[in-house]
Amino acid sequence: MENYTYIEMRERPDLMQAAARWFHEKWGIPKEAYLSCMDAYLRGETEYGWYLCLDGEKIIGGMGVIENDFHDRKDLAPNVCAVYTEEDYRCKGIAGHLLNMVVKDMNAKGFCPLYLVTDHTSFYERYGWEFLCMVQGDGEPQMTRMYIRR
């Protein structure tokens, strides 16, 4: 297995700008939205964290936790969001490691269950997530899958 570094953002607050830019490039959500969430986390205003995988100093994977990942089921919170691994680094266990890290960290902070919206149909089950229901994404014509991690 490769020697990657897995961190939560409080360990490396210096990466906030680079991480916000990276997530913005992957998902198209304004960089400022990521900066706002990350800054609140770094200042201790929320325990909803941000998690990264680094190859040296290069961000190659990441995800965060927010109240609601742009869907109509506001009662299902918090949500793991922005799950992404760079294409050249896929199938190496990075996303799975990050998911397990997030679950462990959030459970230790008293957050259980966690939720996640995705169009994937088998990936998350490998890491203990279960399909819960279909939800309507904000401004989306199609319903999307909601998973739960108890």
Language-model-detected regions and their locations in the chain:
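Active-site beta-strand termini and strand-to-loop segments that position acidic
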Residues: 54-56, 149-150
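Conserved active-site alpha-helix within GNAT-family acetyltransferase domains
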Residues: 108, 112, 118-142
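Short hydrophobic/aromatic beta-strand or adjacent loop that forms the aromatic wall/cage
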Residues: 48, 141-146
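Active-site rim helix/loop that mediates acceptor-substrate recognition in acyltransferases
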Residues: 27-54, 60
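Conserved acetyl-CoA-binding loop-helix of GNAT-fold acetyltransferases
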Residues: 82-85, 91-104, 116
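Conserved glycine-rich acetyl-CoA-binding loop
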Residues: 73, 86-97, 109, 126
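Conserved N-terminal entry element of GNAT/NAT acetyltransferase domains
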Residues: 1-14, 150
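Conserved beta-strand in the GNAT
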Residues: 52, 58-68, 79, 84
